[in-house]
């Protein structure tokens, strides 16, 4: 139970029935200055019922309030401020962390499911830096949802359908080499695709051939289907290398193609509700009442569109997983598409749409410009991660040349630096990409938090921590750490409610800072009766830092 809750219960005993415990708890604040105590309750809402000025009410409550949890209660104007007993609270919090370990701040299972659609690269195209944000934000949102007690289904809605596959088939049959594709699938398929477009400038009939092959694929032709499946399988193997580096897993790889046989039903439903209208030969759903442009369902030639497929996917996911929430971690430029999608689902009478959220994010910039190409070529995410690992290895060799598992640590630090940097600020902001600054061991970086955790683990080894409990402390530096550890459950809840991983990034930075301040002022390893208790505090910090980083998709090496 939180201390806000405990304070609310103590206040309730004095206030009586004017406010419920929940209402009291919602009003409790944290004073801006330490001198004003740990928690504050404003009395304005009681003025009408008590027919007194809030200042007088605060004085009355302060005089009556007593609990072993508080060392001091004072009225400060219209506020009742309490000072928590550092000894009681610190023992309770740190020993709870030590007992629950990585389960600290984990909610009980809710038996409710959240579906998150994220990453979703296009088959036969490079996995570029452009896919980093959706992948790491979606992964963190899922980990945080699990911590909050939800079952989670991560969906990689692959771009595995479309006329480009017809073109690719023509290119492969004319100029392709099976061995070359197997050796380097994405680069080879991209080369063939680019070559097709070059040739089509002088041979426009190639476009017709491409359309014909895609038609064969749509009609279930065996050769076309086999080629498509092969392109998809080879691409996925390549993508998997990146997912393995990032430690990202999915429960479903159902991409666009999966919904081919499910779109007809959507069109029938729209027709049955008289929602389809003709517009310049195409079929659309009018969203005039919602002040949105019409949603295109079928093109002139009868081909279904992106929106039709997403409608089919949303309905399928609800019918399959019975989700309470569905997140789409997709760039901000798709905002209109999702407004239209949710509006059409609402018109179809689906109330599950209330739990659907577009989770947008900003761009990755380099020197202020969109980072998608380097010297005219696409920046591959795998290349960037490998470069980060190499740079991390160089930093580690300089700092700790004798480190036993240096390669493994370099991978954790290099990849962790890239992921942490992406999740450090609110996701809606653009991020400036600079590998050297994000790999620094000081400042607001992943390596700073990882290094703090490694330093704490080193103290535990040097001090031979024996698993003893924490016996209490009332100095300011210990208290700074304790209040941070106490905040973790609240941080977990807030990060989930806002679908905002940066709340956890900020938290682990603040906890690392509080610990480094403690480490700088308290002689942790001094051989006296309190040593094992001090190490218990250090152990609690390592547990929470490691878990906080894990939720972001960042590993925490014990040595660096």
Curated annotation (Swiss-Prot):
Ranges spanned by the short sequence motif 'HIGH' region, renumbered to the chain: 121-131
EC number, UniProt record: 6.1.1.19
GO terms assigned for molecular function: arginine-tRNA ligase activity; ATP binding
Family: Belongs to the class-I aminoacyl-tRNA synthetase family.
Keyword ATP-binding set for record: yes
One GO cellular component term: cytoplasm
Gene from which the chain derives: argS
Protein name (database record): Arginine--tRNA ligase
Reaction(s) catalysed (UniProt annotation): tRNA(Arg) + L-arginine + ATP = L-arginyl-tRNA(Arg) + AMP + diphosphate
Keyword Lipid metabolism: no
Subcellular location: Cytoplasm
PANTHER family reported for this sequence: ARGININE--TRNA LIGASE, CYTOPLASMIC (PTHR11956:SF5), ARGINYL-TRNA SYNTHETASE (PTHR11956)
Assembly information from the UniProt record: Monomer.
Broad class of enzyme this protein falls into: ligase
Location, primary (coarse class): cytoplasm
Keyword annotations from UniProtKB, A to Z: Aminoacyl-tRNA synthetase, ATP-binding, Cytoplasm, Ligase, Nucleotide-binding, Protein biosynthesis
UniProt xrefs under Gene3D superfamilies: Arginyl tRNA synthetase N-terminal domain (3.30.1360.70), HUPs (3.40.50.620), Isoleucyl-tRNA Synthetase, Domain 1 (1.10.730.10)
GO BP terms: arginyl-tRNA aminoacylation
SMART domains for the chain: Arg_tRNA_synt_N, DALR_1
InterPro entries listed in its UniProt record: Arg-tRNA-ligase (IPR001278), Arg-tRNA-synth_N (IPR005148), Arg-tRNA-synth_N_sf (IPR036695), ArgRS_core (IPR035684), DALR_anticod-bd (IPR008909), Rossmann-like_a/b/a_fold (IPR014729), tRNAsynth_Ia_anticodon-bd (IPR009080)
Source species: Exiguobacterium sp. (strain ATCC BAA-1283 / AT1b)
